């Protein structure tokens, strides 16, 4: 796959950025009330059918544990054995029992609620299969497992009857979210080994395979800011541009850590260096950005140079986070959606490394994606899709409590947390439209399969982050030391300031006499 332009990585001057296209018209709408109130904000893709699927409410951890322990015990009893025999048999029964229970529960559990009324259209209204066997198997009310659909769509064996995002808005009408045999094979032989190992060589290969796909590839949906993290909506009553949303986010990051002139800032997983440039120009910070992707470093350092920022002030380095000298101290540290690539097993150690590199009076901004505890089976199917096709090796998307626990175990104190899932949905909606607008270029260079994988990723992620399947957290932490002057942090507790300002503006900030 070519990633070079005239012998070097693509730089901003090589890219013809487009203006984000208008959103496609919903041609699948029933025109009927879905059964629940809907939104009408121009800032996001509003949901026409926000249905809940089966999930945690029908799940029983007690039943699972009983089956895992009881079946080998029962087999041992039938064979005339004892506890040691049961333990030995459990080696062979654990995975089959897990597979059977997850398959049955994901296939036959009812929806959490039926507040949203599904249109009840046949599968063929939404999908056109290329083979007779597929048409015969998935027709009428016989829905296709979503995991199966992915591979059929990417290999051209099925087409969507409309815009991908719109068809996915009605996915409960044509798809199920049950686990398949292929799902378990992937979990067992790819996902779990990645989670357990997370070797340095493995991380390097996965990151470079992903983020060194080609700067042009990312430019075709990220736009001129080249930021692969969520932007921020400042006004839900209008459709801000992608660039406005990303500038909003960059300003918020800098303000939340009270960045000031002369501060040394370490940006771990710096991407194409846009935050480094923003912080250098607007705040006079001295920024060191690190990433494993060579193309990102070339793009970012070129951007710093074009902006007139001397290398002595700010620069990007191509290195592993584990190679950052721990004896070097920084006033501030930022990491935007990088921790997911560290792995759940290594998070606390990674945060401790950050702790050791941070000045005692410094602060760290952590932006991480997460999943809800009140899960639905769809969330798992979507998460595995991300791991398989988009972010190989990224397994650290967890509920908020896990991140907080890791940060506190590393010695930090949480100063603030904001949930920005709906902002991510708005960002992804714009990325999706950019991707469609560059469809011909993508297909010509990377092929139809590649285009379709990212088409579904961006479309489905727009929905997932809007409905809560996944979200994103902005967490600001400081060192939990007695000598920390916490009063200085009051100035940047913007959640408190915003709430109080709203009350004052409404004249509701005092108890009436």
UniProtKB/Swiss-Prot annotation:
Its EC number is 2.1.1.317. S-adenosyl-L-methionine binds at residues 228-229, 265-273, 291-296, 321-322. Pathway: Lipid metabolism; sphingolipid metabolism. GO terms for biological process: methylation; sphingolipid metabolic process. GO terms for cellular component: membrane. It catalyses: a (4E,8E)-4-sphinga-4,8-dienine ceramide + S-adenosyl-L-methionine = a 9-methyl-(4E,8E)-sphinga-4,8-dienine ceramide + S-adenosyl-L-homocysteine + H(+). It is found in: Membrane. It comes from the Eukaryota. Its main location: membrane. It is a multi-pass membrane protein. The chain crosses the membrane at residues 63-83, 85-105. Disruption phenotype: In contrast to the knockout of its paralog MT2, has no effect on methylation of GluCers and exhibits no growth defects. However, a double-knockout with its paralog MT2 is not viable. Keywords: Lipid biosynthesis, Lipid metabolism, Membrane, Methyltransferase, S-adenosyl-L-methionine, Sphingolipid metabolism, Transferase, Transmembrane, Transmembrane helix. One of its GO terms (molecular function) is methyltransferase activity. Belongs to the CFA/CMAS family. Catalyzes methylation of the sphingoid base component of glucosylceramides (GluCers) at the C9-position. Sphingolipid C9-methylation requires 4,8-desaturated ceramides as substrates. Glucosylceramides play important roles in the growth, differentiation and pathogenicity. The methyl group at the C9-position distinguishes fungal glucosylceramides from those of plants and animals, and may thus play a role in host-pathogen interactions enabling the host to recognize the fungal attack and initiate specific defense responses. This is Sphingolipid C9-methyltransferase 1. It comes from Gibberella zeae (strain ATCC MYA-4620 / CBS 123657 / FGSC 9075 / NRRL 31084 / PH-1).
């Amino acid at each position: 796959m070519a990633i070079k332009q005239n012998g070097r990585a693509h730089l901003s001057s090589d890219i013809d950025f487009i203006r984000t296209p208008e959103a496609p018209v919903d041609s699948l709408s029933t025109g009927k009330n879905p059964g629940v109130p809907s939104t009408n904000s121009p800032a996001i893709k509003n949901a026409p059918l926000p249905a809940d699927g089966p999930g945690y409410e029908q799940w029983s951890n007690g039943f699972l544990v009983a089956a895992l322990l009881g079946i080998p015990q029962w087999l041992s009893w039938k064979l005339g054995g004892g506890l040691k025999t049961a333990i030995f048999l459990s080696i062979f029964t654990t995975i089959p029992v897990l597979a059977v229970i997850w398959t049955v529960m994901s296939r036959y559990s009812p929806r959490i609620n039926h507040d949203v009324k599904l249109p009840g259209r046949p599968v063929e209204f939404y999908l056109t299969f290329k083979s007779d066997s597929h048409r015969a198997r998935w027709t009428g009310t016989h829905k296709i497992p979503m995991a199966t659909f992915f591979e059929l769509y990417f290999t051209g064996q099925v087409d969507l009857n409309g815009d991908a995002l719109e068809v996915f808005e009605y996915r409960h009408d044509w798809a199920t979210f049950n686990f398949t045999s292929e799902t378990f094979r992937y979990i067992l032989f790819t996902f779990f080994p990645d989670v357990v190992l997370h070797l340095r060589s493995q991380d390097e290969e996965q990151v470079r395979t992903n983020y060194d796909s080609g700067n042009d590839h990312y430019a075709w949906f990220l736009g001129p800011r080249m930021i692969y993290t969520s932007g921020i909506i400042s006004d839900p009553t209008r459709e801000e541009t992608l660039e406005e949303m990303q500038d909003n986010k960059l300003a918020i990051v800098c303000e939340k850590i009270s960045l000031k002139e002369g501060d040394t800032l370490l940006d771990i997983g710096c991407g194409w260096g846009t935050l480094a440039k923003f912080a250098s120009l607007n705040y006079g910070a001295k920024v060191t950005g690190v990433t494993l992707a060579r193309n990102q470093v070339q793009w970012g350092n070129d951007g710093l140079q074009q902006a007139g920022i001397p290398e002595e002030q700010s620069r990007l380095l191509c290195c592993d986070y584990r190679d950052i000298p721990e004896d070097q101290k920084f006033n501030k540290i930022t990491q935007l959606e990088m921790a997911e690539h560290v792995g759940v097993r290594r998070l606390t150690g990674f945060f401790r490394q950050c702790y050791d590199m941070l000045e005692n009076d410094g602060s760290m901004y952590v932006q991480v994606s997460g999943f809800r505890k009140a899960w639905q089976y769809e969330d798992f199917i979507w998460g595995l899709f991300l791991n398989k096709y988009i972010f190989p090796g990224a397994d650290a998307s967890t509920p908020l409590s896990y991140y907080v626990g890791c940060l506190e175990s590393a010695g930090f104190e949480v100063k603030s947390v904001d949930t920005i899932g709906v902002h991510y949905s708005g960002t992804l909606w714009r990325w999706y439209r950019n991707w469609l607008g560059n469809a011909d270029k993508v297909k010509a260079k990377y092929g139809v399969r590649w285009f379709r994988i990212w088409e579904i990723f961006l479309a489905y992620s727009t929905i997932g982050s809007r409905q809560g399947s996944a979200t994103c957290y902005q967490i600001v932490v400081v060192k939990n030391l007695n000598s920390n002057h916490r009063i200085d942090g009051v100035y940047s507790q913007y959640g408190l300031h915003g709430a109080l300002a709203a009350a004052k503006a409404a004249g509701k900030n005092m108890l009436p006499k």
